[in-house]
Amino acid sequence: MRKQSKIIFYAGIVLGFAAVLTGVALSGGRKIPKDFTVSYDGIKTADITAGVSVHDPSVIEVDGTYYIFGSHMSGASSEDLRNWTSIGDGYTQSNPIFDDLLGTEHVFDYTGSRDSVIPTDDGTYHVWAPDVVYNRAQDLYYMYFCTSSTWNASNLCYAVSDKPEGPYTWKGALIYSGFAKDTIEATDVLDYVDISYAKKNYIIAGNKYNYEKYPNAIDPTVFYDADGKMWMVYGSWSGGIFLLEIDEKTGLVIHPKEDEKNGVDPYFGKRLLDGGHKSIEGPYILYDEESGYYYLFVSYGSLTREGGYQMRVFRSKTVDGEYVDMNGAYPGMWDDNAAYGLKLSGNYYLPGLNKAYMATGHNSAFVDEDGKKYIVYHTRFDNGQEYHEPRVHQYFLNQDGWPCMLPYATDGETIAESGYDISEVAGTYYVINQGTAISARIAQPVKLVLMENGNVYGENLEGIWSMEQGTCYMTITYGEKEYNGVFCQMKDEAGTDVMTFSAVGANESVWGVKYFE
């Protein structure tokens, strides 16, 4: 991305020169703060509500209306990305999102119900993690989703509608997983590989599915690449995240030729990340024209409130990888994946909230018609329950092209692209760094003071910060790490105006919130 000339506010670096360049008199004379006690006195708190509960929300915008679709046959619409109205929910034949999915023949033949070849582990219906995409060639909306019975036995399917809200009519199955010798005949696997290949690769000793190497066929996302080709990324735990091309004219998958050297399987496609049955799921790929990168979002941890659920992101210049993190690395099959991927959000508390957000994850993302970029995810709360709601945050790319997610749910904020006055951004911030751990720990704010002379002070730490001339870009360095991001004025979730920053470095995200005096 294009670099801007840097105006440096670092302590001890020719501050008079910086003042001439900016036309701002840098004080540098303020006393060094000594009290770093975190207090929320005088800060209004509130709960916002989306009005709906949609798990694993996948977003699509059509003519100014935003639609999200989630697990358990749920969906909602919104005009402002904040207030949502349900358009369907639950396993009923009358659910308007589908054209009688529960009564359609063959939908649950293999998985997803108590009567399937592989019955559901709890005897109920399982319809999970849909994704809706507009098929340009057919002028139709395609929903890709899964029916699932166990932690590795699943079936990717698709349905079609002429309207984004549905109803969607089931058209067929695409990919099967979790099969063994006695159930493979109920799949289409042998249409693409012979039985000897299947036994050698997919089925291991004890007549079990080779789940550590091959995927669980759930969590699909379908997208267009820079050249107009359609692709589907999918997978959860098990053998990791896989990629298959989609035939735009039919909506069906294109099975590739085997290429073992490059991780391409003739049935499941190309492995992009992970394997070894580690926590990674909910893949979502978005191509960004501004940076020229494909961004692969995934979630780590367990989706329960205290499961450490969190959002990560990798990127690549090509659609089929390699997808790498800020360190230029990616997790292999047997690596501890906590160290890999830029962590965008996990468990955190910020001022203005009545309760902490927990298990933020399984996100989608999009670039709106006005160029604003958004991340859509579900969150649980620090309230002892598993209730969840969708949230939408605006994000920006820093000067290195990495996503920086704003701290609070979007409320129509617009960043000052020409930057802010130093008096607006200097001051006392509530700062959280969620690190890279996968745990139930809730990140709590610490107090950092950004001085006008470029120094940073906190409890037992010192650092420096800087701004970029005529832009919103900023850098903060403390604890021997550098974080690059943006300043943005917005509202906290109680409606109070705040200055915020969001910056990333070393696969960590740092958020800061300053209240105006």
Question: Model-found features: residue ranges?
Answer:
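N-terminal Sec-pathway targeting helices
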Residues: 1-15
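Hydrophobic alpha-helical membrane-insertion segments, chiefly the h-region
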Residues: 16-27
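Carbohydrate-active catalytic/glycan-binding domains of CAZyme proteins
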Residues: 25-517
